[in-house]
Amino acid sequence: MHLVSSLLVVGAAFQAVLGLPDPLHEKRHSDIIKRSVDSYIQTETPIAQKNLLCNIGASGCRASGAASGVVVASPSKSSPDYWYTWTRDAALVTKLIVDEFTNDYNTTLQNTIQAYAAAQAKLQGVSNPSGSLSNGAGLGEPKFMVDLQQFTGAWGRPQRDGPPLRAIALIGYGKWLVSNGYADTAKSIIWPIVKNDLAYTAQYWNNTGFDLWEEVNSSSFFTIAASHRALVEGSAFAKSVGSSCSACDAIAPQILCFQQSFWSNSGYIISNFVNYRSGKDINSVLTSIHNFDPAAGCDVNTFQPCSDRALANHKVVVDSMRFWGVNSGRTAGKAAAVGRYAEDVYYNGNPWYLATLAAAEQLYDAVYVWKKQGSITVTSTSLAFFKDLVPSVSTGTYSSSSSTYTAIINAVTTYADGFVDIVAQYTPSDGSLAEQFDKDSGAPLSATHLTWSYASFLSAAARRAGIVPPSWGAASANSLPGSCSASTVAGSYATATATSFPANLTPASTTVTPPTQTGCAADHEVLVTFNEKVTTSYGQTVKVVGSIAALGNWAPASGVTLSAKQYSSSNPLWSTTIALPQGTSFKYKYVVVNSDGSVKWENDPDRSYAVGTDCASTATLDDTWR
């Protein structure tokens, strides 16, 4: 026995010298981490669930004064003041609630979702510094007072992720309603709210705005990806309630095409197009988990969590933040505390609970898909990620019967658990989750009881348990057009007035077949393209105005601006596309707006047009200035 023990010690010493992994040590380490995370999740889950609901008005224990259905970012009212409702945060939190509800029916969660829907219907109509509902611009306002009044202070506005994220959250509940026999309720209450947000997304997706961290006015990977998903899922949802979204179908492929431009040849996602940051940002990891579709495999174009690009990016983002004190000794391949981005200076730049949990969640998503498909593919793009965890791995596809497959599954799962274990280490004894924890001491920092932190924990815990959200249709919406186009569609907007849900919306006892739509929907919209040839000078713009709200009710300030992207001296073409309900009759004219704001109208008479009722999806008006 003594001799055998000595040989084992010598063998271990040789492994240490040669840098080879010790399988027994690795298994002990993973078992310890797993038990630690198991215990933390068991303890933290009821705390997180309770504290999340506490931040939702009007009955939440920390939401006194907030309107019904309002998701408060944090009860913190000073240093920092987060006593507001952000459209983005509220949507992400509600999406978590919807996912929990659809997985396990719960009347408390259902009431919370319905109150949220009613609050958002009202909020869409609140005019604010970003604009109003008349042309959709007001939907891009990032935050409001907790009593649903506008916030008029200086802020990074607009932020264009709010509308698509809200649409995604509400579509989740709408799909549950349809699948349980309540399509009429989904159409009368959920669809009008969602329709406004989809119209905003199709109209404004190509305009820059502030990103989810509210600091950079640029195109954002997170916003673009959310916009694509919303239009894809929105089109399918529209059909399920007997409606349609022509703008969704026309614009979604162009957004996905643009999304590919965020991938850097250096092997990571550039989260924002600015020249004063590296672009290595948890923004991209959050994108991957919030656009996770368990039926899409490891699709590259939608940057699914197990795609080679998403995994390569995960490594780069995590590695970029290993310099913090709390990450001392946490070398590549070991879980680390993660923040927003390495250059962050907010509160001097620190790890965030939600960011560290997002790093774990992406890996849990990947493991789920690998197990489902029974194989793992390692490419040259993702090789560095895998080598950190399984040094002997090489490019290739490994089936579930191979030892390499098993080694990867075990290593990635342990790696994911490591991120949760870090969160556990820096969670106070009462289970409260703030926004950040100090990069050196690990002490909680910034806003207390951050609602998004609790949602992030619950989401990561669910994925670890193999509980995943329904598919959003990524597998059938991942094809890229031959060339990218920055096309947009101006939308029509209307206040969602129906906000009272029927009682007893319980799960169906039998499978419900959604209604089959014949012909086109009664509210079918046609994409009407206005082409106007007019010679203009630098600084001038062209608008179309007319007798309907979508054309500004004859007010030039509210008219629709045409694009000059096809303009040339030989073909002075200005153009725009507007989604208009079939059968709509209207009069219209074009105006030239000078740089000083003065307006020149074209000559009489008024032009007139009636949108067809033949279920066509497009129509074109070719006009010349007169």
Curated annotation (Swiss-Prot):
<dbReference type="Pfam" id="PF00723">
    <property type="entry name" value="Glyco_hydro_15"/>
</dbReference>
<dbReference type="InterPro" id="IPR034836">
    <property type="entry name" value="CBM20_glucoamylase"/>
</dbReference>
<keyword id="KW-0378">Hydrolase</keyword>
<comment type="similarity">
    <text>Belongs to the glycosyl hydrolase 15 family.</text>
</comment>
<feature type="active site" description="Proton acceptor">
    <location>
        <position position="211"/>
    </location>
</feature>
<feature type="glycosylation site" description="N-linked (GlcNAc...) asparagine">
    <location>
        <position position="106"/>
    </location>
</feature>
<dbReference type="InterPro" id="IPR011613">
    <property type="entry name" value="GH15-like"/>
</dbReference>
<dbReference type="InterPro" id="IPR013783">
    <property type="entry name" value="Ig-like_fold"/>
</dbReference>
<keyword id="KW-0165">Cleavage on pair of basic residues</keyword>
<protein>
    <recommendedName>
        <fullName>Glucoamylase</fullName>
        <ecNumber>3.2.1.3</ecNumber>
    </recommendedName>
</protein>
<feature type="propeptide">
    <location>
        <begin position="20"/>
        <end position="35"/>
    </location>
</feature>
<dbReference type="Pfam" id="PF00686">
    <property type="entry name" value="CBM_20"/>
</dbReference>
<keyword id="KW-0326">Glycosidase</keyword>
<feature type="signal peptide">
    <location>
        <begin position="1"/>
        <end position="19"/>
    </location>
</feature>
<dbReference type="InterPro" id="IPR046966">
    <property type="entry name" value="Glucoamylase_active_site"/>
</dbReference>
<dbReference type="GO" id="GO:0004553">
    <property type="term" value="F:hydrolase activity, hydrolyzing O-glycosyl compounds"/>
</dbReference>
<dbReference type="InterPro" id="IPR008928">
    <property type="entry name" value="6-hairpin_glycosidase_sf"/>
</dbReference>
<dbReference type="InterPro" id="IPR013784">
    <property type="entry name" value="Carb-bd-like_fold"/>
</dbReference>
<feature type="glycosylation site" description="N-linked (GlcNAc...) asparagine">
    <location>
        <position position="217"/>
    </location>
</feature>
<feature type="glycosylation site" description="N-linked (GlcNAc...) asparagine">
    <location>
        <position position="206"/>
    </location>
</feature>
<dbReference type="InterPro" id="IPR012341">
    <property type="entry name" value="6hp_glycosidase-like_sf"/>
</dbReference>
<dbReference type="GO" id="GO:2001070">
    <property type="term" value="F:starch binding"/>
</dbReference>
<keyword id="KW-0325">Glycoprotein</keyword>
<keyword id="KW-0119">Carbohydrate metabolism</keyword>
<feature type="domain" description="CBM20">
    <location>
        <begin position="520"/>
        <end position="626"/>
    </location>
</feature>
<dbReference type="InterPro" id="IPR008291">
    <property type="entry name" value="Glucoamylase_SBD"/>
</dbReference>
<feature type="active site" description="Proton donor">
    <location>
        <position position="214"/>
    </location>
</feature>
<dbReference type="GO" id="GO:0004339">
    <property type="term" value="F:glucan 1,4-alpha-glucosidase activity"/>
</dbReference>
<dbReference type="GO" id="GO:0000272">
    <property type="term" value="P:polysaccharide catabolic process"/>
</dbReference>
<dbReference type="InterPro" id="IPR000165">
    <property type="entry name" value="Glucoamylase"/>
</dbReference>
<keyword id="KW-0624">Polysaccharide degradation</keyword>
<dbReference type="InterPro" id="IPR002044">
    <property type="entry name" value="CBM20"/>
</dbReference>
<keyword id="KW-0732">Signal</keyword>
<feature type="binding site">
    <location>
        <position position="155"/>
    </location>
    <ligand>
        <name>substrate</name>
    </ligand>
</feature>
<dbReference type="GO" id="GO:0000324">
    <property type="term" value="C:fungal-type vacuole"/>
</dbReference>
